[in-house]
Amino acid sequence: MIRPSLTVLAFLSAAGACGAAQARSDENLTDQAQVAAAHSVADVVVTGSNIRRANTEGFNPVQVIGREELESSGKSTTADLLRSISANTGNGSNETQNSGWSSGAAGIGLRGLSQKNTLVLLNGRRVANYGFPGGGLSDTFVNLNALPMVATQRLEVLKDGASAVYGSDAVAGVTNIITRQNFQGLEFGASYGLADQGGLETSTAKLVAGHGDLETDGYNILLSLEAYTRNRLDQDQRDLTRSGIYTDLPGGRWNGWSAKGARFLVDGKSVPLLNAQGQCPEGMVLTASAPIDGLSGDTCAINLAPHTTLIPSTDRYQAYLFGTKRLTPQIEAFGEVLYSYVEGASLFGSSPFFTLEGGRFALNAETGLAEPVSNLLPANNPYNPYGVATPIEYTFFDLGRTLKTNESKSYRALAGVRGRHDRFDWEAAVFASGSDERETVSGGFAHRWNLADALADGTLNLHDPAATPQAVLDGIRLSTLRPAESRLYGADFKISGELFNLPAGQVGYAAGVEFRHESLVSSNPWQIDAGLQIRPAIAAVDGERDVWAAYAEFNIPVLSNLDIQVAARADEYSDFGSAFSPKAGVRWKPLEWLALRASASRGFRAPSLSENSASTMISYGSVIDPYDPDLPNSRQSPTFFTVGNTDLEPEKTRSYNLGVVFTPTRDTALSIDWYQIKLDNLIGTGNTTAIVQSNDPADVVRDERGKLQAVYNRYRNLTALETSGFDVDFSQRWRTEGWGTFTVSSAYTHLLEYKRPNAAGGPLLDYAGSNRGATLPAHKATTRLAWNRDVFDANLTWYYTSGYDQVPEVGGQSRVDAYHQFDLYAAWSGLERVTLYAKIENLLDEAPPHDASFPGVRAPYDFGQYDLRGRYFRVGFDVRF
């Protein structure tokens, strides 16, 4: 039931509508420099507020990327463009991180906070989250690759907390994708790109058509179609990663597998792990850098580069339809439909199915617990010369490379009406949004029982894998399908206008109510639940909830140059309860060219459905058990469960912002903003060692003898986090006689602090400028020099990411180097209605800086920050009618 606070908020402003005045409407918005240069500015709604205004400087710092910049950036996806902005400082995910969650999906996380703390909107309204959470279970996000690019008019990135306006998730900021409105004409184009070092061939095609003028014809309809395909980039396609050997780099080793015990079964014979010259199946022999089990010499190794993907392949197809119809002079209907199909595919290197130490598990279908899978080669196997069951180490490359394919089908359908009364504007809408995922994994995985049979009767030829009958391999090979679906249904009503006059001007207001239903269901492949897959990856979610909300916002002119903003929102969740989010801001313009702004707010992030529902993830490892009945304080290998917790409370935030905006001329703009975010009740999981030591029966499961069987690690409200920094945005335009127009713009973010404890109850440690737990560079900037003259346009963009401290020091490396990337873009529109363009990304072919904390995980650099595409060429054309 909705609590009184929602009702009060809903009617507080609506009751004042009788004194409101008509608000003007204009859907065009450019960045700060362009707005300052304009001779007149119509009322607009800017992300972070629901009140229309004509001020060029708002209460909140908003970075606006207009259509012109979208095109001249040369970026072919929204995710690539947003990844490059300075406020996206790190600790986020992108589609190159495909091994742990999903090929082809990408999100955005502002301020170094995870992507679940950044709200993504399409035309000011929410869209459904991606079906597979990142970060294990907790990191829910909107897949940017499922949202339209060619239909976008502008991107607005609010770099301040906005729970008082939008509710949950708007902790670090808001990204609002705004599509073209009242567009007439026809545009189509295509592009082709490829990497200088080979691979990653990319093709795009697009079409945008608009018909009808809303003012003269009473209607407008917009249709956009786009297609994007990109080939996969594997490790063996780059010199840095081709061999998988990084021993010449600080802290480096080979990225592969070798036998880890004292003996290794090769060609049916047990041979020494070391001094294995001539006896390695792939012919790859490395010299051990240190004695192993007291021995020294050479060791067999497997190069995983041909079996591991750096950047997944992607096929993406999208259709977007938006229509507006004027019903009366004061009322119009509008609606939109978005459909997106995205498929991504990647290889991930197989690990040995059998190791000499054991450590492989499968799920017991009856108990739901993981149980060990024997690594013993049966005594009667013809390739076992010992006559007794013997441990082996074996990797099933004869089953084919392990290929993971993700299919995602996303949609949003919306219908609404809006109107103007002589005293206020109003709008109402209903919408449905969803995302359906299918993850297929084939090759490299073995059917537990069919494999056991093949080892028992010797039909799996360990001496010559190529001689194994195809029918035997087909019976062993296991392919799995993991489905997921995310749903979002909602309805809203909002009103805005002007309440009454004060000596300094009109008091503006906005108010509204919202309802939405959210659900997330992710299931295990049936083969896992049946106990057929060895070493299964389990991440299942089943949750849903209803959310009711009401909000109000006021813009109060105190003086002719001093305004105050007051906003509040109340949310009622069916699962955890209620949340109240207030915000206050002030804007003072002492001079025509100078504006000061400040804001303070409280916000929240609701526990994600994967955190507070019936969710389960299984992981593997070991832990010291002080209570083991046979050998206390010995290392044991139970089943580790990460599970949801229905008793979670929301994370609570306090956000502060101070800023100054200079616009001394119509061609000059400079803004400096300081921010601070404090989070309490941060949701996370506990330390497994501490859980076992506590021996709480609710979390630690033992058999009748007291042997450790399972450890349950539940999401809890554990810690706090504090982060602060400042942004600098600058733009300067020079108009010349005969030489065209030059523009320099720069967006810079400095991360001052990012403090959180390593464990609950521990002291706050500063992560800023280091990779302690997550890579958080202290400085990030994007600087562009643009030139246009008649039919020529060109720009040079410099992307800078500072180096960071290696914490703790690894392999003698105490600091990771900075990274510089230069992109060059040029366009020519000398043909009537036709524009030809070319782009070179990473002009100097700069390689990612080596990070010794990534010694053998696909590549020796932080692939959350960088990728190995290298210098990249793209050419294309656009035609406009």
Name these PLM-found stretches.
Residues 742-829, 844:
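C-terminal beta-barrel architecture of Gram-negative outer-membrane proteins
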